[in-house]
From Swiss-Prot:
Pfam families: BPD_transp_1
Native species: Bacillus subtilis (strain 168)
A cellular component term, taken from the record's GO annotations: plasma membrane
GO BP, one annotated term: phosphate ion transmembrane transport
Bilayer topology: Multi-pass membrane protein
Keyword check for Protein biosynthesis: no
Domain ABC transmembrane type-1 residues, every copy: 62-280
GO molecular function: phosphate transmembrane transporter activity
Protein's name according to its UniProt entry: Probable ABC transporter permease protein YqgI
Subcellular location: Cell membrane
Length: 294
């Protein structure tokens, strides 16, 4: 077969695959938005949910989702980046290191329901905390930490060796080289990994069913003392997230407008993840320019 024809066929096949993937994503996104846009309003977002009466909102669930996301990433990012840097730069090249990498890959592929059961045993029953925000955040940290470690390790290893060798040749210590050369160069990839991990956290439901619970106590958004039982910042209270609320409304909800609430919540969930990802990518670019003086 003529080389030009073969090249055109291959290009066409790749383009077709890309078009199919794009069509699926656009179709799914459009379906969720179209079904939920009629429910979206300021009142819907700022009103607390209702267990029986129609017209409830998603205020508490939306706050819980972002709050658990914040706490989870507050734990995951330092540990994940530190672990990834160690695996890339300090860990010896031996069978123990290879075994650790294998364990990380296995842990990253565990179903979220398994992580939820582990969290139920460890952070709910064993600690005696019950269903709490911190229990859900720790379970999601177990869920996301292997991904963050692997992404950071790959990002550090992708930095050109010439940069590292030039820094070391000037007599700079390994730690200073990591801090001023490797990490700034790997920041875009690390930020991308953090974004992917954040998206998984924000949309997670199975693990949080067993750790953060299906209920949210009456919250007082004027009470910011984290030790108060009614404070939204209290990490030892149960917290139904938006993803869990959507599942709960669809399967166990008794409200007459359950379908509308679920559609509206799904639209908010998708839009929130999209906006968060765009903002995080912009932030990653700004940090990279600042650290590299570009």
């Amino acid at each position: 077969m003529n080389r030009k024809i073969t090249d055109k066929l291959a290009t066409g096949m790749f383009g077709l695959c890309a078009a199919i993937i794009a069509a699926i994503l656009v179709g799914l996104f459009s379906y969720i938005i179209i079904n939920g846009v009629s429910q979206l309003s300021f009142q819907f977002i700022t009103t607390k949910s209702s267990a029986i009466a129609a017209g409830g909102g998603i205020r508490d669930q939306l706050f819980n989702s972002f709050y658990i996301l914040f706490i989870t990433m507050l734990i995951t990012i330092p540990l994940g980046v530190g672990g990834g840097v160690f695996m890339a730069e300090y860990a010896p090249n031996n069978k123990v290191t290879d075994f650790i990498r294998t364990c990380i890959e296995v842990l990253s592929s565990l179903p979220s329901i398994v992580i939820g059961m582990f969290g139920l045993l460890m952070f709910v029953n064993l600690t005696g905390w019950g269903y709490t925000i911190i229990g859900g955040a720790l379970a999601l940290t177990v869920f996301n930490l292997p991904v963050m470690v692997r992404v950071t390790e790959d990002a550090i290893r992708s930095v050109p060796k010439d940069l590292k060798e030039a820094s070391l040749a000037l007599g700079v210590s390994r730690w200073h080289t990591v801090k001023t050369v490797l990490i700034p160069s790997a920041i875009p990839s690390i930020i991308t990994g953090a974004i992917l991990a954040s998206g998984r956290v924000f949309g997670e439901a199975a693990a949080l069913l067993f750790t953060a619970g299906l209920t949210t106590p009456r919250l007082n958004f004027t009470e910011w003392n984290p030790f108060s039982e009614t404070s939204p910042l209290n990490i030892f209270r149960p917290a139904e997230t938006l993803a869990v609320h959507i599942w709960n409304v669809n399967t166990q909800g008794m409200i007459p407008d359950a379908e509308a609430i679920a559609n509206g919540g799904s639209a908010v969930l998708v839009i929130s993840v999209l906006v968060f990802n765009l903002a995080a990518r912009w932030l990653g670019t700004m940090i990279y320019k600042k650290l590299t003086a570009n």
